[in-house]
UniProtKB/Swiss-Prot annotation:
GO terms for biological process: DNA repair; DNA replication; negative regulation of DNA-templated transcription; proteolysis; SOS response. One of its GO terms (molecular function) is DNA binding. InterPro entries: LexA, LexA-like, LexA/Signal_pep-like_sf, LexA_DNA-bd_dom, LexA_repressor, Peptidase_S24_LexA, Peptidase_S24_S26A/B/C, WH-like_DNA-bd_sf. The active site is at residues 133, 170. Keywords: Autocatalytic cleavage, DNA damage, DNA repair, DNA replication, DNA-binding, Hydrolase, Repressor, SOS response, Transcription, Transcription regulation. SUPFAM superfamilies: LexA/Signal peptidase, Winged helix' DNA-binding domain. Homodimer. This is LexA repressor 2. It holds the Pfam family LexA_DNA_bind.
Length: 213
């Protein structure tokens, strides 16, 4: 798989940061360095680099980018406390709208360590909910939802979806000729995905944490 000029430049940046600082850049730092409008563009290029075998990414680990063939951990990872097999170390990547879609705010390097039994299937990251459109599913403003990264979802599942540069959590409904994202609060209207919109499933909802308020 041939890399684009941008992907080659991102790969060079990753190598430079690991060599200089002992840790790779975050997705936010990559997006900022290349002038991307959102972190989703950085994620797209990282996915392409991983598919090409140039890097690998460690699930559930902040700054989890590794160069292909990198035998050891980064210096930061080497001194961090190990995580047991029965717990998850999940990055909190930003916020997601349970209301009208909001601009994607992805890229925090904060993380939470918790027991695996909280979620099914196992999540890859957490997102903070903003809004109350999913309240009838028990998802409230300020909750941290677990997201299992996948591009595949069935009608009737709760998904984290991207519409253009905006992220939202809704109930997915797939019809013969249209896709709708349904709220679980009668105060909100369904979102119909238009043919000219850039739409993608980012992951499946798989449980939540409710911080003390």
């Amino acid at each position: 798989m041939d890399l684009t000029d941008t992907q080659q430049a991102i790969l060079a940046l990753i190598a430079e940061r690991i060599d200089a600082d002992g840790v790779p850049p975050s997705q936010t730092e990559i997006a900022r360095a290349f002038g991307f409008k959102g972190v989703r563009a950085a994620q797209y290029h990282l996915e392409a680099l991983e598919q090409a075998g140039a890097i690998r990414r460690v699930p559930g680990q902040a700054r989890g980018i590794r160069l292909a063939g990198q035998g050891g951990q980064t210096r930061a990872a080497a001194v961090s406390e190990p995580v047991r097999d029965d717990v998850l170390r999940l990055p909190v990547l930003g916020r997601v709208a349970a209301g009208l879609p909001i601009g994607a705010d992805i890229g925090s390097d904060d993380f939470v360590v918790l027991d695996r039994v909280f979620f099914s299937p196992s999540p890859d990251y957490l997102l903070k909910v903003q809004g109350d459109s999913m309240r009838d599913e028990g998802i409230f403003n300020g909750d941290l939802i677990g997201v299992h990264r996948t591009r595949d979802a069935r009608s009737g599942q709760i998904v984290v979806a991207r519409i253009d540069e905006e992220i939202t959590v809704k109930l997915l409904k797939i019809g013969k000729d249209r896709i709708r994202l349904l709220p679980r609060n009668p105060d909100y209207a369904p979102i119909e995905v238009l043919p000219d919109q850039d739409f993608a499933i980012e992951g499946l909802y798989c449980g939540l944490l409710r911080p003390n308020r």
